[in-house]
Amino acid sequence: MLLAFFPLAFTSVCTAEMCAFTDDLDRFRNSNVVVCPISVDSVPTLKEFKAKENIGVDMLSDFKREVSRRYGTLLEDKFFSNRAYVLIDREGVVRWAYMEDTPATRRQIAELLTQLKTLAA
């Protein structure tokens, strides 16, 4: 499972990232990886975001910020999550994690897939 923390729905970088996950969803599935984007947005906001942008992955709401705090991604001063990626294996062990220096940047999908291949080797 790939947890992909993202700051907020309807922002330019987050929209581009969710669309990229949608475009490459089959590549993740072929690697037996479930992509789980997660943000502090409410469920209704994420549903609207998914419909408006034709996003093909289900997004998780961390509206109470509990998961973001546990994974250390919450930017307390902004009250939203930094962009981060956490790869969890079938046993629930975190195999890899990466947090961006700033929420305005993101890993390219090719980089994430390369990391998956490295871990699978």
Where are these regions (language model features)?
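Chalcogenol-based redox active-site neighborhoods
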Residues: 1-121
